[in-house]
UniProtKB/Swiss-Prot annotation:
Residues 1-17 form the signal peptide. Glycans are attached at residues 24, 37, 59, 127, 182. GO terms for biological process: antigen processing and presentation; antigen processing and presentation, endogenous lipid antigen via MHC class Ib; antigen processing and presentation, exogenous lipid antigen via MHC class Ib; immune response; innate immune response; NK T cell differentiation; positive regulation of interleukin-2 production; positive regulation of interleukin-4 production. Antigen-presenting protein that binds self and non-self glycolipids and presents them to T-cell receptors on natural killer T-cells. Disulfide bonds join 121-185, 225-280. The chain crosses the membrane at residues 305-325. This is Antigen-presenting glycoprotein CD1d. It is a single-pass type I membrane protein. One of its GO terms (cellular component) is endosome membrane. One of its GO terms (molecular function) is lipid antigen binding. The gene is Cd1d. SMART domains: IGc1 (SM00407). During protein synthesis and maturation, CD1 family members bind endogenous lipids that are replaced by lipid or glycolipid antigens when the proteins are internalized and pass through endosomes, before trafficking back to the cell surface.
Length: 336
């Protein structure tokens, strides 16, 4: 009996996602298994709920590690131990079965090889959910579990037909996979959403600044808008001229900071002299509609700056009021 389906089982408490409160939440696992030869292999996994990592499982550890205080969700210790034991059995069996498949397919396929798996469930409003499991071989998406069976994607190589036939013949494992994806995963995620609500709903305001990048060509400038420290992950950043979006804006990948906030930069290449009047605009849920606008050349308007100015003005007013009251008291004492 092949245990590749268990890979999916493992993957259920793991799934990517992006989420906002009262919107869709994605829970997913990414497993990476590398096989240098028949005697050396390793498997590592990470689990995400929305933008937050909730679990990790190193090849060097027998147990799944929690990365959040609420990573067990609402599961009891007994429930969690049962799941963990199943995943331990799965990982051992998966490694063995992949080696058997490679042996069976030789010389068409041989070491080194890499297998990646992603699995989990996406939660929708009203307790609706949708599960998934995808398998990649040597970086190419080749197999999925859909409905009640394993399926080869159209572009997958023909040698996968036999392993998939064997997997689908194992009715007990297929039923277990369905239960884990369609029942256990949504149940576990609901508990995580409740237990991790403060972290999931956290709003961190972005900080933005401008800089000049390396000149892309003679007579041209590269303008760079940096945005950092924001959470949740979704953000909109664009170079503008007045109300006109600049189509040449290039946004890089959104990258994680060490404190679980995010960083993004947006660049714009312009001819020297055409940079006047350009501004970088940042929209984020934490700003509550008060966009950050940074003007190239020094003029800046942002909520943070406004709050600082207001704070300074309040301190000045308080100091003046204190001075006036104190002066009046002294005058009154002199009269007495």
């Amino acid at each position: 009996m092949l245990y590749l389906p268990c890979l999916l089982l493992w993957a259920f408490p793991q799934f990517w996602g992006q989420s906002e409160v009262q919107q869709n939440y994605t829970f997913g696992c990414l497993q990476i298994s590398s096989f240098a030869n028949r005697s050396w292999s390793r498997t590592d996994s990470v689990v995400w709920l929305g933008d937050l990592q909730t679990h990790r499982w190193s090849n060097d550890s027998d147990t799944i590690s929690f990365t959040k205080p609420w990573s067990q969700g609402k599961f009891s210790n007994q429930q969690w131990e049962k799941l963990q034991h199943m995943f331990q059995v799965y990982r051992t069996s998966f490694t063995r079965d992949i080696k058997e498949i490679v042996k069976m397919m030789s010389p068409k396929e041989d070491y080194p090889i890499e297998v990646q798996l992603s699995a989990g469930c996406e939660m929708y409003p009203g307790n609706a959910s949708e599960s998934f499991l995808h398998v990649a071989f040597q970086g190419e998406y080749v197999v999925r579990f859909h409905g009640t069976s394993w399926q080869k994607v159209p572009e997958a190589p023909s040698w996968l037909d036999l392993p998939i036939k064997m997997l689908n013949a194992d009715e007990g494992t297929r039923e277990t996979v369905q239960i884990l994806l369609n029942d256990t995963c949504p149940q576990f995620v609901r508990g995580l959403l409740e237990a991790g609500k403060p972290d999931l709903e956290k709003q961190e305001k972005p900080v933005a600044w401008l800089s000049r990048g390396p000149n892309p060509a003679h007579g041209h400038l590269q303008l760079v808008c940096h945005v950092s420290g924001f959470h949740p992950k979704p953000v909109w950043v664009m170079w503008m001229r007045g109300d006109q979006e600049q189509g040449g804006t290039h946004r890089g990948d959104i990258l994680p900071n060490a404190d679980e906030t995010w960083y993004l930069q947006a660049t714009l290449d312009v001819e020297a002299g055409d940079e006047a009047g350009l501004a970088c605009r940042v929209k984020h849920s934490s700003l509550e509609g008060q966009d950050i606008i940074l003007y190239w050349g020094g003029r800046q308007v942002s909520p943070v700056l406004i709050f600082l100015i207001v704070g300074v003005l309040v301190l000045v007013v308080c100091a003046v009021a204190y001075y006036i009251i104190r002066k009046r008291r002294r005058s009154y004492q002199d009269i007495m």
